C-alpha cells in the first residue's frame, strides 16, 4: 500500500523510475545529477554533436559548512550579492544570491565569473557575514579595504576553460585527454 501511495503521489506510471535519496542537499544533488547523466548516456539520449549552451545565474552567495558550523562563501568573499538581497546579509545569509554566473556546454561548465564587490561597506558586511571580525578582516584584507578609499568602478570578469571546450569538441571523456601535462586526482603526473 505504501509503495502504491508513493507512486500515485508522484504521478508515477508504468516504466517510470522513481528514486529517493537522503543526505545533505549538495551530496544528493551531485549523486542524482551524475546518475541522470550516466543513464542518459547509456540509453543513447545524448547527442554529443549538438551543442547546447546554458547560463547558470543567481548562485547562492553562501553555503553552510558542517565542518566549520558557519556559512562560507560559495565561490569567494569578493562576489557582489544581488542588490535586492543585501538586506539579508546579516539576517538570512542562506537566502542571499550572488551576482555570479557560469556558462555550461552540454552539461560541462566551460567558464565562470562574477561581478566583484566595489563598495567598501558591502565588502565589510560580507566579511562580517563570514564571521570575520574587523580586526581579522583588516589583518587579512586591509590592503583591499584601503584601496576602496580611492574609488573602485563596478567590474566583472569571466574565465573560460579552453581545455574543457576542446575536450567537448573532440568527444573526450576526461579533460586529462586534451591537456599537455595531465595530473591525476592527487595532483601527481600520469
Predicted regions mapped to residue ranges:
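Structured aminoacyl-transfer and RNA-binding surfaces used for tRNA recognition/handling
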Residues: 1-190
Amino acid at each position: 500500500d505504501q509503495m502504491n501511495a508513493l507512486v500515485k503521489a508522484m504521478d508515477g506510471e508504468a516504466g517510470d523510475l522513481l528514486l529517493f535519496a537522503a543526505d545533505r542537499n549538495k551530496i544528493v544533488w551531485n549523486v542524482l545529477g551524475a546518475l541522470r547523466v550516466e543513464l542518459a548516456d547509456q540509453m543513447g539520449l545524448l547527442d554529443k554533436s549538438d551543442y547546447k549552451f546554458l547560463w547558470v545565474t543567481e548562485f547562492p552567495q553562501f553555503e553552510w559548512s558542517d565542518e566549520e558550523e558557519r556559512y562560507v562563501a560559495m565561490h569567494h568573499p569578493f562576489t557582489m550579492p544581488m542588490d535586492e538581497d543585501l538586506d539579508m546579509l546579516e539576517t538570512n545569509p542562506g537566502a542571499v544570491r550572488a551576482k555570479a554566473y557560469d556558462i555550461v556546454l552540454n552539461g560541462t561548465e566551460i567558464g565562470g565569473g562574477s561581478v566583484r564587490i566595489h563598495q567598501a561597506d558591502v565588502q565589510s558586511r560580507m566579511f562580517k557575514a563570514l564571521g570575520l571580525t574587523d580586526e581579522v578582516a583588516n589583518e587579512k584584507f586591509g590592503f583591499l579595504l584601503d584601496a576602496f578609499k580611492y574609488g573602485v568602478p563596478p567590474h566583472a570578469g569571466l574565465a573560460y576553460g579552453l581545455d574543457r571546450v576542446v575536450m567537448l569538441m573532440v568527444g573526450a571523456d576526461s579533460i586529462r585527454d586534451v591537456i599537455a601535462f595531465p595530473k591525476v586526482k592527487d595532483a601527481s603526473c600520469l
